[in-house]
UniProtKB/Swiss-Prot annotation:
Source organism: Oleidesulfovibrio alaskensis (strain ATCC BAA-1058 / DSM 17464 / G20) (Desulfovibrio alaskensis)
Main location: cytoplasm
UniProt entry keywords in alphabetical sequence: Cytoplasm, Isomerase, Porphyrin biosynthesis, Pyridoxal phosphate
Names of the cofactor(s): pyridoxal 5'-phosphate
Gene from which the chain derives: hemL
Substrates-to-products reaction catalysed: (S)-4-amino-5-oxopentanoate = 5-aminolevulinate
Protein name per the record: Glutamate-1-semialdehyde 2,1-aminomutase
Source species, domain of life: Bacteria
Subunit field text: Homodimer.
Keyword Transcription regulation: no
Length: 422
């Protein structure tokens, strides 16, 4: 990894931490980052000439794998016509039609340029629509780096053990109410004390940024009922789960319909994109037809729209249950191998995602996720990477499996797990 290390040293002189998103620095796994030259299918190729089987997928967008021919073709054709217009184009409508057709809760949708923009905009809309200010979020859930969401957040905030962040005034997070994930009783108590002031509950319907944590039976339905009772909006942050758990996302998978949904990652096919949508009466409060302002220079970017259209067209044909069955078998075998080594381990999995927690206890919320042994994960990560298996450089993230992963890829993954020593 000599060239990767040299590039990292060069980057650190110019870019804070040498990276443009904190987890990529690999600090929590005591490693230098791999600098990537290209991706193809299920593989990444580093500047050092190494091939890796990729189980990160750019943190989730690449359910089709790297450089999918249909997506690449759409991108090339779009960029040949121009990279950005700052004016409406037909592909904005075509992608909106695909999203509305797929996602149960969405009657209208607004395109933005990132998942963070989507969640920030959805919260502003919820506050504008309800005339209330308070928000309930869950410990360990990550909704981007908007100020209101950086209280007890997951993802890089959890990876780097940052309790919050300087630069966010106390007055901003004062309206953010926290509850443990899967703890409906705590949510009930918050509504009993603040119900008239709560604009929304935002939740990852399957948590993916404290590692993968499934919703307990009745949890999402309970949130739906509480929001209905108190007149608050239920926001599903489906930036990770949208088009991954099923074509209609987590809300289709679990059969629970939120008021607003945020999307990102997969809907751009690897291009920078986000979206938020919901019931027509709520979405019509957004400017210019309503009084809740939101805008973006690159929102509806034609290249990103083309990539999204091509991606969703391919995913509409995908066999999601078959992929889930394959991933469940893979995760079960990984868990069995590690347990046979005498290692404390719990492997949470759902659809095409899984997380290896080095703890014997069930992981059902942020507190139990934090009990996992980070030192064991570091050893595991380093040895897996040395064997050509590219995992997230954090125990608080998910392994992502794509439709491009083959049985040979799975066999190589399992062989590498067998070779790990602790």
């Amino acid at each position: 990894m000599e060239r990767s290390r040299n590039l990292f040293e060069r980057a650190q002189k110019l870019i804070p931490g040498g990276v443009n998103s904190p987890v990529r620095a690999c600090l929590s796994v005591d490693s230098a980052p791999v600098f990537v030259e290209r991706g193809q299918g299920s593989k990444l190729y580093s500047v050092d000439g190494r091939e890796y089987i990729d189980f990160v997928e750019s943190w989730g967008p690449l359910l089709l794998g790297h450089a999918h021919p249909a997506v690449n073709k759409a991108i090339h054709e779009a960029v040949d016509k121009g990279s950005s217009f700052g004016a409406p184009c037909e592909d904005e409508i075509r992608l909106a039609e695909a999203v509305v057709d797929a996602v149960p809760s969405i009657e209208m949708v607004r395109m933005v340029s990132s998942g963070t923009e989507a969640t920030m905009s959805a919260l502003r809309l919820a506050r504008g629509y309800t005339g209330r200010n308070k928000l309930i979020k869950f410990e360990g859930c990550y909704h981007g780096h908007g100020d209101a969401f950086l209280a007890s957040a997951g993802s890089g905030v959890a990876t780097l053990s940052i309790p919050g962040t300087p630069g966010v005034p106390d007055t901003v997070v004062a309206d953010t109410l926290l509850a443990p994930y899967n703890n409906l009783e705590r949510v009930k108590a918050l509504f009993e004390n603040h119900g008239a002031d709560i604009a929304a509950v935002i939740v990852e319907p399957t948590a993916g940024n404290m590692g993968l944590v499934r919703p307990a039976a009745g949890f999402l339905q309970g949130l739906r009922e509480l929001c209905d009772r108190y007149g608050a909006l239920l926001i599903f942050d489906e930036v990770i789960t949208g088009f991954r758990l099923s074509y209609g996302g987590a809300q289709q998978y679990f059969g629970i319909t939120p008021d607003l949904t945020t999307l990102g990652k997969i809907i751009g096919g690897g291009m920078p994109v986000g979206a938020y949508g919901g019931r027509r009466e709520i979405m019509e409060r957004i400017a210019p037809c309503g009084d809740v302002y939101q805008a973006g220079t690159l929102a509806g970017n034609p290249v990103a729209m083309a990539a999204g259209i091509a991606t969703l067209a391919e995913l509409k044909k995908a066999d999601y249950p078959a992929l889930e069955k394959r991933v469940d078998a893979l995760a079960s075998e990984i868990e069995a191998i590690l347990k046979a080594k005498g290692v404390p381990v719990t492997v949470n999995r759902l659809a095409s995602m899984f997380t290896i927690f080095f703890t014997e206890e069930p992981v059902t919320d942020y507190d139990s996720a934090k009990k996992a042994d980070g030192t064991l994960y570091t050893r595991f990560y380093q040895q897996m990477r040395d064997q050509g298996i590219y995992l997230a450089p954090s125990g608080f993230e998910c392994a992502m499996v794509s439709l491009a992963h083959t049985e040979d890829d799975f066999a190589a993954m399992l062989a590498a797990v067998r070779n790990v020593t602790f």
